[in-house]
From Swiss-Prot:
The record marks Y161 as: Tyrosine radical intermediate. It is an enzyme of class 1 (oxidoreductase). The D1/D2 heterodimer binds P680, chlorophylls that are the primary electron donor of PSII, and subsequent electron acceptors. It shares a non-heme iron and each subunit binds pheophytin, quinone, additional chlorophylls, carotenoids and lipids. D1 provides most of the ligands for the Mn4-Ca-O5 cluster of the oxygen-evolving complex (OEC). There is also a Cl(-1) ion associated with D1 and D2, which is required for oxygen evolution. The PSII complex binds additional chlorophylls, carotenoids and specific lipids. It comes from Chlorella vulgaris. Pheophytin a binds at Y126. The modification Phosphothreonine is found at T2. GO terms for biological process: photosynthetic electron transport in photosystem II; response to herbicide. [CaMn4O5] cluster binds at D170, E189, H332, E333, D342, A344. Keywords: Acetylation, Calcium, Chlorophyll, Chloroplast, Chromophore, Electron transport, Herbicide resistance, Iron, Magnesium, Manganese, Membrane, Metal-binding, Oxidoreductase, Phosphoprotein, Photosynthesis, Photosystem II, Plastid, Thylakoid, Transmembrane, Transmembrane helix, Transport. This is Photosystem II protein D1. Belongs to the reaction center PufL/M/PsbA/D family. The lineage of its organism: Eukaryota, Viridiplantae, Chlorophyta, core chlorophytes, Trebouxiophyceae.
Amino acid sequence: MTAILERRESASLWARFCEWVTSTENRLYIGWFGVLMIPTLLTATSVFIIAFIAAPPVDIDGIREPVSGSLLYGNNIISGAIIPTSNAIGLHFYPIWEAASLDEWLYNGGPYQLIVCHFFLGICSYMGREWELSFRLGMRPWIAVAYSAPVAAATAVFIIYPIGQGSFSDGMPLGISGTFNFMIVFQAEHNILMHPFHMLGVAGVFGGSLFSAMHGSLVTSSLIRETTENESANEGYKFGQEEETYNIVAAHGYFGRLIFQYASFNNSRSLHFFLAAWPVVGIWFTALGISTMAFNLNGFNFNQSVVDSQGRVINTWADIINRANLGMEVMHERNAHNFPLDLAVVEAPAVNG
């Protein structure tokens, strides 16, 4: 009898836990994805803060030349970063227990891999949690779909690119100047500015900013007057009101006359779908471009493609970019190799005798 009661209490406790996890009445929705999201993001955030403040220098290139990234080792907020895991580790899974000591783990950049792996699980769980909450509320799933764009971008630079290049040391450092360094080196090695998927990403980000500003300014400029001159226009809206707060016909007429008629949406639903889809698709393409360049399917190469009748090269902007790429590549990992990879792979001329 006691065993039966204990089983009932246990089942009841589990049932109450399940109900609490999936309840939409909580101030913050947890969800089953949240059960994974909370510990992984807390771990990633905690280790990031500790490592950013106090991590010792990391031998990023695997040549016994440690690079300092933390505040206590001479950096500031702008120059500081979590240094990627050492090239000596490559793509090996490198948890703390795989190192001979904690000092060795820190020297080889173990915190970077720990942070990236937990962060990846956390943001994927956050995306799943968005879908889960939408499902429970009877909403459509497009919020999670939109969030998949930054998830894809983060996955590309932190996971796919290191896999393609053969080492986590090629991943993006977790810091401001480290991010810029990653961008410069990426351009030098892959000519990303000449990759069409990057161009689509630029169009998505800047186009999304433009469309967001246009939409916000049009709506703000065509609000239906509900207040006096002495009140804020924002007081004219009450949360949950049924009537429209702005005149879409006026906004449509203005923009149609400013550009041309068919440049303006006359359907609010299709307009907002467009505002969501444009940057999302652009960032998807950028993430796809990073993932292909990870395996050295690089941007277009138009170097020395224009010549005169005598066969002499007429430089174009492609040649200027190529010269800049070589200069940046020379300065990258300058103690790990003596020449840019583009020059190092050229065969030496044959010597007779």
